[in-house]
């Protein structure tokens, strides 16, 4: 009641197959699958690049901070 039954879906599927043909539907499915695969690959590469940039910034920041070579005993002797 109000919803789409299995019979209505089957009729729509038959009409689509008759209009486009199985070869064309297969090609559309292949193209769509390739597009989704490419999108996922681009997203994962972008995440890897972002992680690399964060690590690089942390390394540069830690390298830029001066490192003291004096120990506490050296500081006490100077005072």
UniProtKB/Swiss-Prot annotation:
Family classification: Belongs to the TatA/E family.
GO cellular component: a single term: TAT protein transport complex
UniProt-annotated stretches for the region Disordered: 45-79
Biased composition range(s): Basic and acidic residues: 51-63
Subunit structure as annotated in this protein's UniProt entry: The Tat system comprises two distinct complexes: a TatABC complex, containing multiple copies of TatA, TatB and TatC subunits, and a separate TatA complex, containing only TatA subunits. Substrates initially bind to the TatABC complex, which probably triggers association of the separate TatA complex to form the active translocon.
PANTHER family linked to this entry: SEC-INDEPENDENT PROTEIN TRANSLOCASE PROTEIN TATA (PTHR42982:SF1)
Highest taxon of the lineage: Bacteria
One Pfam family linked to the record: TatA_B_E
Annotated GO biological process: protein transport by the Tat complex
TM annotation in the entry: 1-21
Annotated source species: Alteromonas mediterranea (strain DSM 17117 / CIP 110805 / LMG 28347 / Deep ecotype)
Function: Part of the twin-arginine translocation (Tat) system that transports large folded proteins containing a characteristic twin-arginine motif in their signal peptide across membranes. TatA could form the protein-conducting channel of the Tat system.
Record bears the keyword Protein transport: yes
Origin organism lineage: Bacteria, Pseudomonadati, Pseudomonadota, Gammaproteobacteria, Alteromonadales
Cellular compartment(s): Cell inner membrane
Protein name, per record: Sec-independent protein translocase protein TatA
Keyword Metal-binding among record annotations: no
The entry's keywords: Cell inner membrane, Cell membrane, Membrane, Protein transport, Translocation, Transmembrane, Transmembrane helix, Transport
Membrane topology qualifier: Single-pass membrane protein
One annotated GO molecular function: protein transmembrane transporter activity
InterPro entries linked: TatA/B/E, TatA/E
């Amino acid at each position: 009641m109000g919803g789409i039954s299995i019979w209505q879906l089957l009729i729509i599927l038959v009409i689509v197959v008759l209009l486009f043909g199985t070869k064309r539907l297969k090609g559309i499915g292949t193209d769509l699958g390739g597009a989704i695969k490419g999108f996922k690959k681009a997203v994962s590469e972008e995440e890897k690049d972002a992680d690399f940039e964060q690590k690089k910034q942390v390394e540069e920041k830690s390298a830029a901070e001066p490192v003291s070579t004096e120990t506490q005993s050296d500081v006490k002797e100077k005072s």
